[in-house]
Amino acid sequence: MTLNKSEVSWKSPSNIALIKYWGKKENQIALNPSISFTLKNCYTSTSISFIKSNNFQYEFKFHGNHKPEFIPKLDVFFSRIKKCLPSLSKLSLNINSFNSFPHSRGIASSASAFSSLALCLIEIESMFSNIINEDNFFEKASFISRLGSGSASRSIYGPLTCWGKTELYPGSSDQYAIPINIKNNNFPTFCDSILIVDSGIKKVSSTLGHQLMDNHIFKNERISQSHLNSSKLKKSIESNDINSFQEVVENEALTLHALMMTSNPNFILFKPNTINIIEHVLKFRDETNTKICFTLDAGANVHLLYPKSSFQIVQDFIKKSLIVFCDEGRFINDEVGLGPEKN
């Protein structure tokens, strides 16, 4: 075929899980379903220029620089997807990627990175093959994203997304994420203020953490809990019960870190200032009745979730009481968004 262009570009956001997944089966399948808010301002933009080649090859740059430390993970990713995207076998790719937020500063970037890369690759495949069409484009992108990073599958849609088979959401799948239709027009748009407690690289990778769930003493209990919490979360959103929503989100965050601390070997990823922030948030909520809750990724940073209508009061609270616990006073304000955009 004759191509009218040889470059594609997408930007895709990160996401914050409300229902966490922790542990994997074979082939990048999660141990339990997960549900997340898609973010808006924390995104990765990826561009790929390509030419025909005798065999597959790629060059990768991040913010204009070669990053050898990224190559092993990319090699694994491309080895996983080559059967799904046959056109890649005869292409040479020049990949350029950048984040809107600081890399290695405690913000999980694999979700935005692999989802933006997957969207570009799916668009390229659609130029050479009829297996990609308008109806399955984003589903295929979510599938491919999962093979790079499980959480990346959820970044393909917004504002609320589910990855993993569950009776709660018809059409849900272990292979890709689906958008959740919020059946409540009164459910507020949420903000996510990310408090940077630790900017360093995690001592224990999420990959190792997932592996430690294989023989975890609480493995089966966690699977049951995640399904129960998913049901509670769905009901809280549909009934506009923010108190119940907050309870589930915080329970999931604390459970995630409890699983880390009770694995063998065990490990702790939060820091003293993580606890300081949580204690101040709970006290602030009790004293002011502000609708605000915390959640945590597999790290030390704290995500504050609250309705957009409370933005100013929460900003004042952060600057007055929480910024002292942030690494060099850093925090990032984001909000729930609608998903990826074509550049």
Enumerate the predicted regions with their spans.
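Gly/Ser-rich oxyanion-binding loop with an adjacent helix/lid
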Residues: 83-187
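Charged/polar, low-hydrophobicity segments characteristic of intrinsically disordered regions
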Residues: 76-80, 151-162, 228-232, 236
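Short beta-strand scaffold segments in enzyme catalytic cores
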Residues: 17-20, 44-49, 152-155, 159-162, ...
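ATP-binding N-lobe of GHMP and related small-molecule kinases
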Residues: 1-105, 119-130, 134-135, 331-343
